[in-house]
């Protein structure tokens, strides 16, 4: 299933209509019908995607025990960057995860703990035995989000490399963002072909990844083709290219998320996306392709997380305008999720 924006088609149709309306009304009627069919098809695709996301969302029931709907690990947080792992972790909880663990550097731990008593914080990421310490928890985790607030310290990056290897060995889904993507650009083999990996680069990070794995120059006029090609070059792993429209590909198809957001871009909203995607990836893989109508579960999860993040941005901007921050966006997760995915 591929969803493409149709705003450009409408503009083209308007210009063509103006040019030919006086001379050739039958042709105009044909073109207008073509646009109508295109619009109807795109709308149907969007409706289908919303339904597929709803299909993976677990029902709330008193028969479950704590932890069944998601135990998510966040790997990141250093002396300079403590907000990002908090944003990712609290977003996972707000979306519906039951527990969130944050594995961070020792100096970051007291700060992150002070932000919220709801996060379980492990000050181990800069220790000599960090990989072993995180490995102890991997059997209890459903997904990992790697990169928020990580920084580029060599010790931290080397420890994260070992954690990623252990995560793959246990077949745990992993979302990689921020400086986790810096590490991948240095060592693409860490994720090459790992079908439970999702990368979430912005424009700069995407370009860095492209240069790391592809020798040909990027076609800047064909964004969908570029994200498709980068995914293929990395062994058909799922990639979310964040931008004016979010483009999501697994090397076989491209989904476009153009849910209305706002013109406000504040630091941290990518962490909301990665945390949301961590729990949605777990839900989607647990539900399986039968719940996603044969579509890739990770594609559906990624589209859902992108749509949710944009709706949070939209709702917060309506209230706060230019002063909108990621904290304001996170406060809208409940309302946005209910509006989009609750029937």
Swiss-Prot record:
Q: Which cofactor does it need?
A: Mg(2+)
Query: How is this protein annotated for GO cellular component?
Result: cytosol; mitochondrion
Q: Which reaction does it catalyse?
A: (6S)-NADHX + ATP = ADP + phosphate + NADH + H(+); (6S)-NADPHX + ATP = ADP + phosphate + NADPH + H(+)
Quick one: signal sequence residues?
none
Q: CDD domains, from UniProt?
A: YXKO-related
Its BP terms in the Gene Ontology are: metabolite repair; nicotinamide nucleotide metabolic process
Under the heading InterPro entries, the entry gives: CARKD, Ribokinase-like
- Organelle targeting sequence: 1-42
Q: Which GO molecular function, any one, fits this protein according to its record?
A: ATP binding
Instruction: Fetch the Gene3D superfamilies from UniProt.
Output: 3.40.1190.20
Q: Where in the cell is it found?
A: Mitochondrion
According to its UniProt record, the EC number is 4.2.1.93
Please list the residues that bind ATP. 242-246, 261-270
Q: Where is the YjeF C-terminal domain?
A: 49-340
> Which family is it part of?
Belongs to the NnrD/CARKD family.
What is the annotated role of this protein in its UniProt record?
Answer: Catalyzes the dehydration of the S-form of NAD(P)HX at the expense of ATP, which is converted to ADP. Together with NAD(P)HX epimerase, which catalyzes the epimerization of the S- and R-forms, the enzyme allows the repair of both epimers of NAD(P)HX, a damaged form of NAD(P)H that is a result of enzymatic or heat-dependent hydration.
Protein's name in the database: ATP-dependent (S)-NAD(P)H-hydrate dehydratase
Source organism of the structure: Rattus norvegicus
Q: Which gene encodes it?
A: Naxd
